[in-house]
């Protein structure tokens, strides 16, 4: 499929909307009423610090809702107001935040069900309204919904769309897209659907493994087994890794994405020489500004004198998970929670998710005496949720 041609035709359809329905001013007011917090605003104005009794709170200087998330959430709410009686569907979670998704369910927005990773669109009918989430949707899903006669409300973050343009450029010039991401993540599934040949690498370790293979030091069967769910149909590592371009899932760790780009640039330089580098490697710049800002702020926060650190965001949120990883590199006692309800004031306990593990209960997690607590949140977490967490910490400390 010519994905660029399809997207152009879709954008000209009278059943497609990527601008929403309200003015920017009205949209900002609605979000402020729903999700902003006077407490958080006050802490921002006070240099991102807040002291109450023995508790000293230090907020990251960039956290919470990014503008892409704000736009997606606002457009989803506007859609229900604009279509008060129609069937409204959404192809996935609008963002990785349980409270926001629960609110959409209360507005009678239906979530497309999936079994074994395959979505069931059989109940979606002609004239229904379908919201595409901030992560985007695969080009095959868009085509199916358009052919069904649905009204498509596209809340895809423009930074994600930028990555789609990048992999389409790779395809046009017959380069294989090396996508730094999680192959099951909604955003990476969408991005890979716009690519030609592609290979998804999770981290620097996998990138180095691929690099070694390109330089003739790997085993084909082992390679194919290792990446069996992470490459395009018909992918041949002996042919399709001679010309590569790098792209990324926008919520991945910025520093790792940059290093992966350098790995493949050095690999192609070594294999083909400097005079042929541009014929075998395409440079990239698909790192999201908001992701970069939040990760940079987290690196600054973990350099503070902290006793514990609380990271707030959906457990399936990639950008939140990477914030947790940064805390771990500094050996700070950190706790990843998705809602304030994970904290029990009465028990001084927290039900949290250690990186790569199942949920576990930590009792007496807030130490006695004066305590410095660092707090940050993922790009899908509203300020009100952060404020509710702080209020619980204050109640425990008092």
Curated annotation (Swiss-Prot):
GO biological process: dimethylallyl diphosphate biosynthetic process; isopentenyl diphosphate biosynthetic process, methylerythritol 4-phosphate pathway; terpenoid biosynthetic process
Reaction(s) catalysed (UniProt annotation): isopentenyl diphosphate + 2 oxidized [2Fe-2S]-[ferredoxin] + H2O = (2E)-4-hydroxy-3-methylbut-2-enyl diphosphate + 2 reduced [2Fe-2S]-[ferredoxin] + 2 H(+); dimethylallyl diphosphate + 2 oxidized [2Fe-2S]-[ferredoxin] + H2O = (2E)-4-hydroxy-3-methylbut-2-enyl diphosphate + 2 reduced [2Fe-2S]-[ferredoxin] + 2 H(+)
One example GO MF annotation: 4-hydroxy-3-methylbut-2-enyl diphosphate reductase activity
InterPro entries linked to this entry: LytB/IspH
List of catalytic residues: 187 (proton donor)
EC primary class: oxidoreductase
Required co-factors: [4Fe-4S] cluster
Record HAMAP family: IspH (MF_00191)
Protein's recorded name: 4-hydroxy-3-methylbut-2-enyl diphosphate reductase
Species in which this protein is naturally found: Prochlorococcus marinus (strain AS9601)
Chain's gene name: ispH
